[in-house]
Amino acid sequence: MASTVGLAPGLSRKLKKVLDCRTDSPDLVASLNALSSFYDENSAHARRNLRSTIEKRALQINSEFLNAADSTQIALDRVEEEVNALADCCDKIAAALSSSAATTSDIISTTERLKQELEVTTQRQEIVNCFLRDYQLSNEEIKALREDELNENFFQALSHVQEIHSNCKLLLRTHHQRAGLELMDMMAVYQEGAYERLCRWVQAECRKLGDTDNPEVSELLRTAVRCLKERPVLFKYCAEEVGNLRHNALFRRFISALTRGGPGGMPRPIEVHAHDPLRYVGDMLGWLHQALASERELVHALFDIDSADHQSNAKNTSENIALKAGESDFTFVLDRIFEGVCRPFKVRVEQVLQSQPSLIISYKLTNTLEFYSYTISDLLGRDTALCNTIGMVKDAAQKTFFDILKTRGEKLLRYPPPVAVDLSPPPAVREGVSLTLEIIENYNSMMVSASGEKPAFDPVLSALLDPIIKMCEQAAEAHKSKKSGQLPRRSRTSSDSSQLTSVDALLSSSPSPPQNNETPSKIFLINCLCAIQQPLLRHDVASQYVTNIGLMIENHINLLVQNEVDTLLHKCGLSDKMQIFRSSTSELPLSERQDTSPAMLSECLKAFFGLVLGSEGSLPEFEQIQVPKLRSEACVRVAKTLAEAYEVIYQAVTDQQNGYPDPKSLARHPPDQIRTILGI
């Protein structure tokens, strides 16, 4: 029955709602906890009055809240009253401000207008101040330019004038050209007056520099000279003034050093040593070099070259050209300063050269003048009066040296010595070589400046030794002419001197060649050239000359060997036949020719073998050649040349085309055997 009867719809919904309600939700748990705080009896009456109980509880809570909010409400009411009062005050103030704004609007507009005018006036004032600074001189600057006393303020004012003058050029590019021209004219007047005054002051200061030997250049004077460089004409006047003053002062000091010496006589006068040319000239050059260093330092400090060089490193080409012009002025002043000492120096050096110094002294003087010529030109410049003077006296000393050599050489050539019996060099050769070695030592020890180099030594060697060699050649020629009428004799000693073999008879009957009388003269020349060459081998400076002498010796050795070989072949009767053996081109065999017939050739070869196989003295040994190496070399060359000549003859004899009947009996020694016999 219960399953068939359904529940009422409202109850069913409520029941479903209760069943669907989640008992673990936080709100439900909180509600139940709050209910348990005042619902403590679970009875039927209490459950029926649950709603009313809850509503009473809610009313109680609201009543408590209202009681608690009464004081707050009272405070809020008071605040509202005060806010209303404050709003009334603000309204009154706003009304007062509105009335004030209406009354002060004219004042505010006037103030704004005046403020804008003040800004414009301030800008104009700044522009005027900038214009006055860039285009006008202050009273203090004008006073500094016109005062008699020069100080740093003068140079600052002058620099400002130059700046204003440069700024005026900018005005000329605008529509203010008239103002620019007027300002430029005004600044030009100030500038020219200042430069003229500056020039007079610098000239006065420079006159003070000429009164002392070692003046000090103040920084103010350096600045003044640096400023004067902007006016080349005025600067040149001052530079000439400095040059003239120091010129006179240096001349007086040089004459005093020559004649009076230093203070109290120390150092002693330079002319005390006039008897010693080297020291005399060296002391004068040393004094000039020391004075040049001092004067150069003075002019260098005065013109402030280092500062100009430093400033030009970062500037354009035109300023570098200006720097070169400054260096030219620097050289001009130094040149002017030292012009005065040129003449007394030149006169004294010429007097030394006219006193006929010795050859060594004149050469040392030339080297000393050469060294100082380069040294002073490095400091002063090459195209200056002092350098030209030193160059002139150096040339004069060099001319004196070569004139002495020329006179000495002419004397040797005028009176050539006779040739000694042993063909040894004459004493003049040894003296000339000794003198040459001494001059070489002086050349090797001469001073050379950093920019200079040693002069060529070959002309000195030629002037020294060429006349000696020519003298030896003349002596040799005279010796040869003396013996030209005599026939040379050569003796040959055998074991039995009373008997002559057929070979000896042939040799003695053969006419001697005309070249034989040249042998002693050639040996004499070789000895002389070796006497010159040997001492020079240790010196590099004479290497080229030694090489040339070696070529001459080689040439004389060749001629000597050829003459001796021709003499030997002529004695054997082979001299005129060698050309036939070397260039036999005729169809007629050599055996059928009269001069190369077997009988004639047999006699000639017997004589040749007699020379080769004979006793000592048959072949020349050149005992009078004083250099063993050359003597041995000459003997070897003679032997080689004879062996080569015999080989030509042997090949012609053994050649079947020449038709010799018994070549082996005719030329019984092969060439190798002859070489062995000759020791080659």
From Swiss-Prot:
It comes from the Eukaryota. It is found in: Golgi apparatus membrane. Keywords: Golgi apparatus, Membrane, Protein transport, Transport. It comes from Arabidopsis thaliana (Mouse-ear cress). It is a peripheral membrane protein. Component of the conserved oligomeric Golgi complex which is composed of eight different subunits and is required for normal Golgi morphology and localization. Interacts with COG5, COG7 and COG8. Belongs to the COG6 family. The gene is COG6. Pfam families: COG6_C, COG6_N. Required for normal Golgi function. Its main location: Golgi. The lineage of its organism: Eukaryota, Viridiplantae, Streptophyta, Embryophyta, Tracheophyta. GO terms for cellular component: Golgi apparatus; Golgi membrane; Golgi transport complex. One of its GO terms (biological process) is protein transport. This is Conserved oligomeric Golgi complex subunit 6. Residues 479-517 are annotated as: Disordered.
